[in-house]
Amino acid sequence: MTRKLVLLRHGQSQWNLDNRFTGWVDVDLTEQGRQEAAAAGKLMKDEGLQFDVAYTSVLKRAIHTLQGALKELDQDWLPVHKSWRLNERHYGGLQGLDKAETAAKHGEEQVKIWRRSYDIPPPAMDVTDPGHPGHDRRYATLDRNALPGTESLATTLVRVLPYWHDAIAPQLKAGQTVLVTAHGNSLRALYKYLNDISNAQILELNIPTGIPLLFELDDNLQVQSYRYLGDPEAAKRAAEAVANQGKAK
């Protein structure tokens, strides 16, 4: 039996538009982002996808993308589970900074390493910083010492995988069709795990906003196939635009 899993990165956020490092900062969608969410829902509807359960982060840009997509799908009733483990990678001291200005200051190669390497985190945010998640009530039930002040993709994967194994994978194994709406790096982490790609290969992977990525999995959740829904050239162009965000102007 083929299991179906869709990974969907949130639509354009205000800080995507502003070309700023976002991480765990809770910024909302732009009007374009809301349109991308609806368009993603239409692509999934045209594909004939009938979901059984959905998962998202505790950040509004992902939550609102999921809501917009489900509305277009006419599946608003779907059970939705939110977890901090699906949050974007924490960008530490880079959060809020302009990507192009940071590239001009530190060099494009350094910014590419911070953005896309596997195991090198950006400079950490101090725990006393008001923006540290330890000061955010949505994480009040978690051990403050376990909350990140920065993350690499490797540590993001360590954060995401327990939720995959404990919550998402059992639903897929039970034959459920699953939608995960999250963020560029939490989805890159899942992509790396599912496709078992190397640390070097993940450096070149960019996930575009608002375009559903459909995986077909076997009974053991091994990948049989995967593809972006809609126009593959449009997905390619959108991924290239993500890659270019870290370049100096």
Swiss-Prot record:
Annotated site residues (Transition state stabilizer) in this chain: H183
The UniProt record lists the keyword Lipoprotein: no
CDD domains xrefs: HP_PGM_like
InterPro entries named among the record's database cross-references: His_Pase_superF_clade-1, His_PPase_superfam, PG/BPGM_mutase_AS, Phosphogly_mut1
Reaction(s) this enzyme catalyzes, per UniProt: (2R)-2-phosphoglycerate = (2R)-3-phosphoglycerate
Single GO BP term: gluconeogenesis
Keywords associated with the record: Gluconeogenesis, Glycolysis, Isomerase
Positions that bind substrate: 9-16, 22-23, 61, 88-91, 99, 115-116, 184-185
Enzyme Commission (EC) number: 5.4.2.11
Pathway named in the protein's UniProt entry: Carbohydrate degradation; glycolysis; pyruvate from D-glyceraldehyde 3-phosphate: step 3/5
Function statement: Catalyzes the interconversion of 2-phosphoglycerate and 3-phosphoglycerate.
Family in the record: Belongs to the phosphoglycerate mutase family. BPG-dependent PGAM subfamily.
Subunit-structure text: Homodimer.
Record's protein name: 2,3-bisphosphoglycerate-dependent phosphoglycerate mutase
Gene: gpmA
